[in-house]
Amino acid sequence: PVTRVRYERERPGELIHVDVKKVPRIPEGGGHRALGRGCGSRRGAGTSCLHVAVDDNSRVAYAEQLPDERKGTTCAFMERALAFYEGLGVTVERVMTDNGPAYRSGEFNALLEARGIGHKYTRPFSPWQNGKVERMNRTLAREWQYARAWEGEDARAEALASFIERYNWDRPHSACGGLPPMSRIVGVNNVLAHN
């Protein structure tokens, strides 16, 4: 049996957990949650990829639903995630990922190296090592992805940004003593004001 060690980094940006999760697409007009399973013989709509980044200390999250998990897409997501954290006044020091091909690519590692950011990999088949982003994936599934019967993929994708904003600014988080994740950044080094 593996002993899992719980930890929390001392300051925002010290470690950002990053992961990709495949998400089934919803056909226009709604899927089986909206129409019921016996709605006809519709073909599957395929999948998209939910790219997620979570700060270890504050639990502030950034996520985008993108068409794939190729290295170009993953690098572009990482650029935007880093810009998001930098916009909050957070200096990212290190990123933790699994061993997926996009994260192992030279382009992804060059992007981090050019910014002076370290890259730590989890051990193969050890998702608990990246547990904070894995837990965020579960929260996204419960509170956004399957929270209601969506009428189509566009409606669900549009709701992601507002869910992430609500998660960061308003939703109580047990790791933050019942306060929202942004409470660990605001007043410390945040350069933005929430409306």
What spans do the regions from the language model cover?
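Basic, flexible linker segments flanking DNA-binding modules
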Residues: P1-E28, P101, N109-A110, R123-P127, ...
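Active-site beta-loop-alpha junctions of metal-dependent nucleic acid enzymes
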Residues: G40-C49, E64-G89
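Short small-residue beta-strand/loop micro-motif enriched in glycine and branched aliphatics
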Residues: V60-E64, K120-T122, Y146
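Mobile-element integrase/transposase regions
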Residues: P1-V54, V60, A76, N195
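RNase H-like polynucleotidyl transferase catalytic core
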Residues: R94-N99, E113-K132, R148-E151
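Acidic/histidine-rich, metal-coordinating catalytic segments
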Residues: E69, L88-S105, F125, G177-M182
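C-terminal domain-tail junction helix/linker
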Residues: P1-R6, G13-E14, R115-I117, R138-N195
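Residues immediately flanking
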Residues: V20, D56, D68, N99
